[in-house]
Amino acid sequence: MGHDHDHNHDAPAAPVDWREHGVKVIRGDQLDTNTPQTPGMNRAAAINAARVGAQKIWAGTVTIHPNAKTGAHHHGALESVIYVVRGHARMRWGEHLEFTAEAGPGDFIFVPPYVPHQEINASTDDPLECVLVRSDNEAVVVNLNIDAVEAPETVYWVDPIHRHPHDH
């Protein structure tokens, strides 16, 4: 049964110093490049345990130079979300990187735990810039040595509430 009074049963005994324990703004020119790297890309951390005390997420940026690609890798038990800010990403994934899909500015990419994958800058002229968020407070990167297929299958994922754009 609910209460008819207003108070928090879990309130801390001492007042919280919200200046110290509240919102933190991390400036774009103050990102930390001392984070696990994968050949072909540059990662920089904005949010992690060491910098801001994050308990359950890691966030940062990734830049892939024109016509470059990363080595194959996965992120252990972590889920990853990539948001494409600028440029065009070509993702490959699978045991032999046998699947591919592309994403552009404004698109989100979800990478489940333990999925071997590779990010490719689909442009020969412009950098690919993305925001990256992972489901733990530290970056986990396991670089892999994979024999990739020569011609991966293009996959267009359709969620349960949206139609495939070619089904109109």
Residue ranges with predicted function:
Residues Q55-I57, H75, A103, A122-T124:
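Short glycine/proline-enriched turns and hinge-like loops at secondary-structure junctions
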Residues H65-N67, W93, A103-S123, V133-S135:
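Conserved metal-binding segment of the jelly-roll/cupin
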